[in-house]
Amino acid sequence: MAQEITGHYVTIDNTRIYYDECGKGIPFFCIHTAGASSLIYRYFLPIMADNGFRVIAPDLPGHGKSYPVNWEPFRNMHQYAEFVWKIAKAVCGGEKPVVNGCAIGGDMALDLACYHSEECRAVIAMQGALQTKTFPDVSEDEQTHACPGWQDIFERAASMAIYYPCPPERVRELRWHHRFNGQYIMAGDGQTWVSQDCRGKLKNIKCPIMLFKGEADYYVPEKLIDETLAGIKEGLGEKFIGKKVGHYPIYEEPGYAAKVVMDFLKRKKVI
């Protein structure tokens, strides 16, 4: 029987932040994808909880049930990641977490590894790389009048980046995950994605880190994964190419993604 997911709130820098929690044990902190919410992890959380983790997945600022910081979206990856780290510190009870991020969350996870690796047990960066200038400039599209078709465009941008064939109901659910966050916030996420720049910082990573790329994902070419891995000290980093998954492994095939993560953590003697 799957463990129950419960909802909680925490206040960070006068900003009310929502997070899902499931299970007990070592903190396993999950950072969601651009324009979505913690819902993207709804199938993954109970599986990791059954593996002995206290799994935590916040709604990023301005997403889902979380308020934005100072009523503005983030537009810079490092600033975004530093705020998310404050969330992790507040909810992990003083314990070192395993940090797992996907897509924009994967970029954040990599940024956190560069700046806070000594405070992490391990990091899993799914669809994250040292640079991700792989999305158009959306800085002029924050307001609805600037791009009236934004919602459908963004939903398609998400649903086309998964592995096919995929059950139609899973595609519909993924589109819904990207339907209820405002254009203002989603455009901020797009700007944040292209601002990612960990060049020169990868040498600072001191904890085990896995770079996970879904084979069907076209937002992060394998070349970027290889360039990222090359900058990490030998023995700490691993690359994994996920079969029959795309941009959202933790949603598309949560059981498979969990097994890959568990195998990595055991191999690196994190657990």
Spans of model-derived segments:
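Flexible "cap/lid" loop of the alpha/beta hydrolase fold
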Residues: 110-115, 120-150
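Conserved catalytic-core motifs of eukaryotic protein kinase domains, centered on the activation segment
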Residues: 40-42, 66-72, 135-136, 222-223
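Gly/Ala-rich beta-loop-alpha elbow adjacent to hydrolase catalytic centers
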Residues: 101, 105, 109
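Active-site loop/oxyanion-hole signature of alpha/beta-hydrolase fold enzymes
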Residues: 50, 57-100, 255, 259
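Conserved loop-alpha-helix segment in the C-terminal half of the alpha/beta-hydrolase fold
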Residues: 206-245, 251, 256
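Conserved alpha/beta-hydrolase catalytic His-Asp/Glu region
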Residues: 134-135, 150-206
